[in-house]
Amino acid sequence: MYTTTLNKIRLHNPCTGGWAKLLKTLGKTQADDDPVPLSLILQSNGLEDAIWTLQCLEGADREIRLFAVDCARQVQHIMTDQRSVEVLEVAERFANGQATSKELGTSRAAAQAAAWAAAWDTADAAADAAWDAAWDAARVKQAEIFLKYFGE
């Protein structure tokens, strides 16, 4: 189980609403160094705030990268360019110490080029509609994945 503290969160300038919500959930009025489970932040504030809080963790780079890869794999079936799939494989290998930062950078650049190429080919209206539907479905699954890596 991963935890952070209110003091660590405060150092990263959280949004006012999310901060107030978390303090209220914890029954506190100010920051302290008591451990706060990330799963509680997910439950209290939702996935976006829980993901934002990952920047407050130390020593969780591997899990954060694997979480990102796992979330991206949820939409891998709609990736039409092999470079996008390959960057997931390299990122996962990198997280597990099986790829170099140079390999990761090269595959990331290739995937970004693929993303730009795809973006120019997509009509804005269709993209917006698809994004909204996919976003809603993906957020539910991503909350489950978040708990897999950072829950109790």
Where are these predicted regions, by residue range?
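Short, glycine-biased loop/turn motifs at secondary-structure junctions and
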Residues: 1-152
